[in-house]
Regions:
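S-adenosyl-L-methionine
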Residues: 1-319
């Protein structure tokens, strides 16, 4: 434990900083008719190769972390005249319509009118950061990924659209992971990431507090560039181990030395950025990181004009 103020963390719909919005991935509500495993995908393509145009990789937390493969039919921009020429797709569309029509919930039955579409579509049109909603407490870092818009994220992932290497670097750092461990909920003992509590309350280094610390534009740009370079090095270190899943790479017992070193360099770059917001040069551990982040949170939220949202969770500055 360290000396730190007792702070109430609000549940927020938007982030306290000027950062991209975080949302859940898309929700099919299809009785499995849009979802394909490897065997089904191959069988469909062998039967009618026109189907390949409409098949996308489909990732939830399991697929992201463990490298298992899953696919989906993604028909958001499909030409209706083309779909009508592919009987195997029409069969699945019809099955979705019939299943939704048979449900008890009125909202689900209403969705039967659009059987080509997922029930909830939040798929970005650009690259995005994917964050598993639940991650093992054994990991020092929650494994996140930068994904192409061609990869469809399920509602078992959080999606940060329009994110850059800078955002990926901050979110992948020990600083952010210390915040997660301090304020997130738990599923059994695993960390449950949260948009409203974790992400939207996280105090980023270059929001009002950096101005309070009198950081120059040149200092900010230099710090951002250093984080981006270090984040790229983390991705490069991952790529140097093909065949290893994120679960393999981020198990503390099997984490490769080059990836660990890349994260240490990323942490150094992120910590230096937080110095511009008044942070110390070094931290003895998570407790000191969290104590500083809570003080920065107070400074940043104190500058917000909007009234705080209803209070949900009490944060404790402890390791």
């Amino acid at each position: 434990m360290v000396d730190a103020p007792d702070i109430l963390i609000d549940s927020r719909r938007t982030a306290i900083g000027d950062v991209p919005e975080i949302v859940y991935g898309s929700f099919a509500l299809d009785d499995g008719n849009f979802t394909l495993d490897d065997q089904t995908r191959t069988a469909l393509i062998n039967a009618d190769d026109r189907i390949v145009e409409y098949i996308r990789p489909f990732l939830g937390g399991e697929e992201l972390l463990h490298g298992t493969r899953r696919w989906c039919l993604w028909l958001r921009a499909a030409n209706p005249s083309n779909l009508r020429k592919i009987p195997l797709i029409l069969e699945r569309i019809n099955a979705v319509r019939d299943w939704r029509s048979s449900r008890d919930r009125a909202t689900t039955r209403k969705l039967a009118a659009t059987p080509t579409l997922f029930a909830e579509i939040r798929q970005p049109f650009s690259d995005y950061i994917a964050i598993p909603t639940v991650s093992s407490e054994r990991r020092n870092f929650i494994p996140m990924a930068l994904l192409s818009a061609e990869v469809i994220a399920s509602n078992q992932l959080y999606v940060v659209a329009g994110a850059t290497l800078f955002h990926f670097g901050i979110l992948s750092s020990t600083m952010h992971n210390a915040w997660v461990r301090a304020v997130c909920g738990r599923l059994e003992s695993r960390y449950r990431y949260s948009a409203a509590i974790v992400y939207n309350n996280y105090p980023w280094p270059f929001t009002p507090a950096a101005e309070q610390a009198k950081a120059s534009d040149a200092q900010v740009h230099k710090a951002q560039a250093a984080i981006e370079a270090a984040a790229r090095a983390v991705l490069d270190a991952r790529a140097a181990h093909p065949g290893s899943s994120l679960a393999d790479l981020y198990d503390p017992l099997t984490m490769p030395a080059d990836l660990l070193k890349a994260h240490q360099r990323l942490d150094a770059a992120v910590d230096k950025a937080y110095q511009l917001a008044g942070g110390p040069k070094t931290y003895a551990g998570d407790a000191e990181r969290v104590a500083f982040l809570f003080s920065l949170y107070q400074r940043q939220t104190g500058l917000l004009a909007a009234a705080p949202a209803p209070r949900r969770r009490r944060g404790a500055a402890s390791s």
